[in-house]
């Protein structure tokens, strides 16, 4: 079911991140950041919460959290979280996006939430917000 899919995703993403780290082995890679839109945002959030690699920052645009497996990493990470969601999103309703971000907030993650009037879309304003977040 979904738990098996999450476990397979975590295994695959661990390998992907490790491959990127190995590829850039001559540089000091100490800050891995993730971001995504919709299901990509959900994937970024799930990996941040459950993955084995340390994530420095993560941004979610119109994201949500799927049903999560029982085993989870320790709470109170210093991973910075940016959550952007739209009040007019008909695909990922704002309450689902808020729930995902509240889950991180309740675990002690530093979080910045931006609520907009956008629908289920990635806007130029979102890209500017991402740039500012990752460059701060």
Question: At which residue positions do the language-model features occur?
Answer:
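Short beta-strand/loop motif that positions the catalytic acidic residue
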Residues: 82-85, 89
